Regions:
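Intrinsic-disorder/low-complexity signal
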Residues: 1-755
Length: 755
């Protein structure tokens, strides 16, 4: 079990984990028949091996190779059901809305019971003669229930293989250390890897974890192993304690207030068809779920944590005020008032006394009063006391109090800020100071909203706004150069892979899906080979047979402003074909939907962009373990004439899995640029039962923001200039080599900003 967990983590970094000593690898060894057979199986799944891994495989037994094959098959979903509703769905069935309407009324009046000619299917639906061509379906064309499953997938149709490398115990420990030290919040893939690694390796002594959310995962591990006292070192403020308690209650490492979660539950379970709408019931159930109830052991643990905080009562109170309403509930539920009267809990008593008296003015209150009084000097002096808050309010402060004065004060404290914060300012400046741009935000509750521009922008001329953007960019580039120059290095040459110039730095773009076969950063561009892109959606793995309707769709935007959708309600669109709408899942093996895009047809029709989406039509969020992605090959990809299976793991270019903590009902997962023949991987959640509820203005805004962000390659060029490094033509000739494989670990990329 341990090795299987480590193998799954290694696959995310395009590697295979082997429990061997790399020093014992014999590079002269010839591959055994078992190794050659294993490599052939890897090719069927779209993978190849480099030379080091090939020789390393000779050191493991055939049984271990079989176990590795089983894990890779499971990750790629080879044993699941990939049949869809229509046989040979690349040829349209010719069904119409009239077929659905006639079938609806035929079932309404009794079907065969009243003498109508037709066929009654196992699901109970009556299909009148002359409507749906039943010989073309694997299930019911009216209610979407599948009757048959498939136990095969196509293999080996890929034109390009993904090379795997060797990972040993030392490599995985380095991954673990990079996650512990990550200066940016972990995305869903990193979080899943971290939880597995901390269970295997434990938490190192005297570890420093810079990210609060990562610290909560570590605290959870310590508490689960009865090490509550050791967890105290990671809980330095009352907010840290509240964050852990709320994570324990809800499963989210961010503090999401109860009213937000209740409103979110109502949105998730809203259904456009009234009888299926469960929004009110879901809201009541969420309210019950969030009720606080703790046993005595838990209460004493939290009381000790607060009592042992190194903060003064006034500092602790100010920290608690931001979530005062939640703290009032927690204090009552945890019986902290009772514990504060016990001997040894005097510090807890002082904190609660200061919290309830509210006698001391808060820092934020004083700052807001100075803002209201337009006291520029006081505002800037106070913001310099908290550089992080200064950075987050920099743009609004520039508009309100003037660019020059604000930037002069800001530049005095830039050396106290992490580079990732300055980088995010540089990436956001152009969009913020553009009066005509669409600004989008992605709340942690799983949807995307557009926000209005700052009204103060109208007070400045275009030249003034451009000057503000230039000043911000100049500030962060100079700061980055200064930070890189301050680093001691013995290197004289550097290699930067060309592909890194197409991958933006992931600061501010945290993925909520799990990537089991790679760790592509949001904004990564994938070139399209061949003339077809095949989208796929697989859901229902591990679930019993039940109605569960997930949908895959695409939105086609043409140069003339026209748009078309290819979805369950329109199976044939310009340059796109849908495999049929399934609304129920078979037992344990799931089911699948597909869309095939023809690039020649799209180009001929003048299509510019195609946006890929997945939605939960059923009440609730996207199903956990749902897998979505796309296939691509220079060679034609087959479609089964018997079951509609169109999945080939070797052709998968990118795929993601929905995590258990998913908070979205819809997901935009890619945009195809028809002219450039490339797909941009992005992740934009939204709340809607189908693609018609997606805000494509927000999608375009996100796409442009990703393309305008500083790329990894550009950041490395700044590093090379600051440290006077010359560019090397290959990794072997460089003192420092930054390859695509290195970029597969987002924590390593983020480490560049941890200065």
């Amino acid at each position: 079990m341990r090795d299987k967990k480590l193998l799954r983590i290694a696959l995310r970094y395009r590697a295979i984990y082997l429990d061997i000593d790399p020093k014992e690898i014999d590079l002269e060894t010839k591959p055994t028949p078992a190794v050659l057979a294993f490599v052939a199986r890897l090719r069927e799944n779209g993978f190849s091996v480099n030379e080091d891994l090939l020789h390393a495989l000779c050191m493991v037994s055939a049984t271990e190779l079989a176990d590795i094959t089983a894990v890779i098959d499971d990750v790629m979903g080879v044993k699941l059901n990939w049949a869809t509703l229509v046989k040979g769905w690349n040829v349209p069935t010719g069904k119409t809305r009239a077929d659905h309407l006639i079938t609806f009324f035929a079932n309404l009046i009794g079907g065969a019971k009243v003498g109508l000619e037709g066929c009654t299917l196992p699901c109970g639906c009556f299909i009148p003669e002359g409507t749906f061509p039943l010989e073309r379906y694997t299930g019911c064309p009216f209610c979407g229930t599948p009757f048959t499953t498939a136990n095969f997938v196509y293999k080996g149709q890929a034109s390009k293989l993904k090379e795997l490398r060797l990972f040993t115990e030392e490599d995985l420990k380095q991954v673990y250390q990079s996650l512990l030290a990550s200066p940016t919040p972990l995305d869903a893939t990193q979080k899943d890897s971290f939880e597995k690694l901390i269970d295997i390796y434990g938490l190192p002594d005297n570890v420093e974890i810079s990210m609060k959310e990562t610290a909560m995962l570590a605290v959870k591990h310590l508490v689960a192993n009865g090490q509550q006292a050791q967890a105290q070192a990671l809980l330095k403020t009352p907010t840290d304690i509240l964050r852990y308690l709320w994570y324990e209650k809800t499963g989210y490492v961010q503090i999401i207030e109860p009213r937000t979660l209740i409103a979110q539950a109502r949105r998730f379970y809203y259904h456009m068809f009234g009888p299926l709408n469960q929004s009110e019931y879901a809201g009541k159930e969420m309210k019950k779920k969030l009720k606080l109830k703790y046993d005595r052991k838990h209460c004493q643990c939290v009381a000790s944590w607060i009592n042992n905080l190194a903060l003064s009562p006034q500092q602790a109170t100010e920290n608690m005020n931001a979530k005062r309403g939640m703290w009032v509930r927690m204090i009552r539920a945890l019986r902290l008032g009772e514990y504060s009267r016990r001997k040894g809990y005097e510090h807890l008593a002082d904190i609660l006394d200061a919290f309830y008296r509210q006698e001391q003015p808060t820092w934020l209150g004083i700052l807001q009063q100075a803002r209201n009084n337009r006291d520029t000097q006081t505002v800037l002096q106070m913001l310099k006391q908290r550089p992080g808050l200064f950075a987050r309010s920099l743009f609004a402060t520039m508009l309100r109090f003037g660019c020059e004065e604000t930037m002069e004060a800001f530049e005095q404290v830039t050396d106290q800020m992490p580079s990732r914060l300055l980088l995010s300012l540089g990436n956001a400046a152009e969009k913020y100071f553009d009066p005509d741009a669409t600004r989008t935000v992605h709340p942690i509750t799983g949807y995307t909203i557009s926000i209005p521009k700052n009204k103060l922008l109208s007070l400045y001329s275009p030249a003034d706004l451009r000057a503000m953007v230039a000043r911000v960019k100049q500030c962060y580039i100079l700061s980055l150069k200064h930070s890189f120059a301050a680093q001691a290095t013995k290197a004289r040459t550097i290699y930067i892979a060309p592909s890194l110039f197409d991958i933006p730095i992931s600061v501010g773009d945290r993925s909520a899906t799990i990537q089991d076969t790679s760790c592509a950063l949001m904004g990564t561009r994938f070139p399209v080979e061949g003339d077809a892109v095949r989208l796929f959606l697989q859901w229902g793995k591990g679930l019993h047979a039940q109605p569960l309707d997930m949908d895959i769709s695409c939105h086609i935007a043409f140069e003339n402003g026209k748009t078309e959708d290819c979805a369950y309600y329109r199976l044939k669109a310009t340059g796109a074909k849908h495999g049929g709408d399934i609304r129920a899942i078979p037992d344990m093996v799931g089911t699948a939907e597909y869309i095939e895009l023809s690039l020649p047809e799209l180009a001929e029709a003048g299509a510019k962009y195609v946006t890929f989406t997945a939605n939960a039509y059923s009440c609730g969020a996207l199903s956990p373990n749902l897998v979505v992605g796309w296939m691509n090959s220079a060679y034609p990809m087959k479609v089964s004439e018997k079951t509609g299976v169109a999945y080939d793991p070797s052709c998968v270019q990118h795929m993601v899995r929905i995590s258990e903590s998913n908070l979205s009902r819809g997901l935009v997962f890619g945009v195809l640029d028809v002219d450039e023949r490339e797909i941009t991987w992005l992740e934009m959640p939204f709340i809607s039962q189908n693609i018609q509820g997606c805000d494509f203005t927000a999608v375009n805004a996100l796409l442009q923001r990703l393309r305008n962000k500083l790329s990894i390659g550009q950041l490395l060029e700044i590093k090379a200039e600051a440290q006077h490094l010359s560019l090397a033509p290959s990794p072997d000739e460089a003192d420092e080599a930054y390859t695509y494989e290195w970029a597969l670990n987002p924590a390593e990329v983020s480490a560049l900003l941890n200065m």
